[in-house]
């Protein structure tokens, strides 16, 4: 089926002075927009419990934003920013952050024209000893560069990023990252490193709000989706359907699939990253039905969700996925997706 979305329908004026450059002192004091029965009203986030349906189970994305921006220099002095997007070798996120000595990442490189060859360096001191991180271009991966990092310090790559990297805040804030961003541009429930942008809907939760919701009977579950830099990419084509969606990696535990089935009809996804993860499960399950395997190494395609028959329900999809994980003794399913959910014509599954 041919699809067309006129991107001009989504144009609107957003004056710079209307963009909050810094968070409120209290996360949950932010405004909450409520849509109910065709009417829009305004509330506060700390009153979220008043708006949730009885028996709700919130699904959080527990990804953690990494200090992905590294400012490096050529021996000539040229300043070049290396923005780490996703691990290349090793490709597994957990291993990529735990590795020592060398690794390779898919990166966006600022001022790339100044980096034709040779190493970029950043000098630092560890326990009084001079150290150095070096970066080499080793190839391209579409719009990104494959960059190999090497170092002698007894640090993991994750520890190096914590020491030398900067937090990547949204470009529309039009400011440099500051100390406050290292704590406030993270959700309070973030656990697993890998994102270059925060799952922003979750930024307004506080431990106190989560505790009060739990006391009121709200349940919680978590998925992990590492948000990619493509979330900031503008749609440049007049037809949004011709915009190539970026790849994002996600994982879900078998116990989570079990609880989704147990709480079917009461699932409330927190933010679009949780939505994208949950909806992608239907495509993986449909692959199992058709091919006998979810083929996790193949990203869920941009329009793959639309190829699933209307008769195939979300509950069936979760049951199919759970049975596959049980047969193969999988505690966690890891996959990736490039899906686009358009405003008209999409049938929600989960």
List the model feature ranges, each with a label.
Residues 1-350:
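Surface-exposed, charge/polar-rich loops and edge strands
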């Amino acid at each position: 089926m041919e699809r067309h979305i006129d991107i001009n329908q989504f144009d609107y004026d957003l004056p710079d002075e209307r963009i909050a450059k810094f968070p409120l002192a209290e996360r949950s004091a932010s405004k909450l927009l409520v849509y109910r029965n065709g009417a829009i009203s305004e509330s506060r986030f700390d009153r979220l419990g008043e708006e949730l349906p009885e028996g709700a189970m919130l699904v959080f994305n527990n990804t953690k934003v990494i200090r992905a921006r590294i400012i490096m220099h050529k021996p000539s002095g040229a300043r070049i920013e290396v923005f780490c997007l996703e691990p290349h070798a090793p490709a597994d996120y957990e291993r990529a952050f735990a590795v020592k000595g060398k690794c390779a990442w898919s990166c966006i490189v600022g001022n790339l024209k100044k980096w034709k060859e040779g190493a970029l360096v950043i000098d630092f001191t560890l326990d009084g000893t001079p150290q150095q991180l070096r970066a080499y271009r080793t190839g391209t991966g579409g719009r990104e560069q494959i960059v190999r990092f090497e170092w002698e310090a007894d640090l993991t790559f994750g520890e190096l990023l914590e020491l030398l990297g900067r937090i990547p805040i949204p470009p529309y804030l039009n400011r440099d990252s500051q100390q406050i961003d290292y704590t406030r541009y993270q959700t309070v429930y973030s656990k697993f490193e890998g994102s270059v942008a925060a799952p922003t809907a979750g930024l307004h939760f506080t431990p106190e709000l989560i505790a009060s919701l739990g006391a009121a009977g709200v349940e919680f579950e978590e998925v992990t989706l590492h948000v990619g830099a493509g979330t900031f990419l503008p749609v440049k084509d007049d037809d949004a359907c011709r915009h190539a969606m970026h790849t994002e990696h996600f994982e879900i535990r078998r116990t989570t699939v079990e609880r989704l089935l147990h709480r079917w009809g009461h699932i409330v996804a927190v933010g679009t990253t949780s939505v994208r993860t949950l909806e992608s499960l239907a495509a993986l399950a449909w692959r199992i039905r058709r091919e006998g395997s979810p083929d996790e190494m193949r990203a869920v395609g941009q329009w793959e969700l639309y190829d699933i028959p209307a008769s195939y329900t979300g509950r069936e999809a979760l049951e199919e996925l759970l049975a596959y994980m049980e047969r193969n003794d999988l505690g966690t399913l890891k996959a990736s997706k490039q899906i686009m959910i358009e405003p008209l014509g999409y049938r929600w599954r989960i």
